[in-house]
């Protein structure tokens, strides 16, 4: 799944900090600290980051597109 532009619950724009979140997560930082630094404060917005799958820097969408 491609990361959403807005939070599904509150509609806040969250995609603007996704690349930094992804980079810092890849570097081994704690996800809670990253979201705090990026000032993602609402639980609904934080859930969008926590539930988005990243395995070996690949998103679920990257796996699905191989079978189109």
From Swiss-Prot:
Keywords: Cytoplasm, DNA-directed RNA polymerase, Metal-binding, Nucleotidyltransferase, Transcription, Transferase, Zinc. It comes from the Archaea. GO terms for biological process: DNA-templated transcription. Zn(2+) binds at residues 7, 10, 44-45. Pfam families: RNA_pol_N. InterPro entries: RNA_pol_su_RPB10, RNA_pol_suN_Zn-BS, RPABC5/Rpb10. Part of the RNA polymerase complex. DNA-dependent RNA polymerase (RNAP) catalyzes the transcription of DNA into RNA using the four ribonucleoside triphosphates as substrates. This is DNA-directed RNA polymerase subunit Rpo10.
């Amino acid at each position: 799944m491609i990361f959403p532009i807005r939070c599904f619950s509150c509609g806040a724009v969250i995609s603007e900090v996704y690349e930094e979140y992804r980079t810092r997560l890849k570097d081994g930082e704690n996800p809670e600290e990253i979201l705090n630094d990026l000032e993602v404060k609402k639980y609904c917005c934080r859930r969008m980051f926590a539930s988005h799958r990243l395995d070996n820097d690949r998103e679920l969408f990257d796996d699905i597109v191989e079978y189109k």
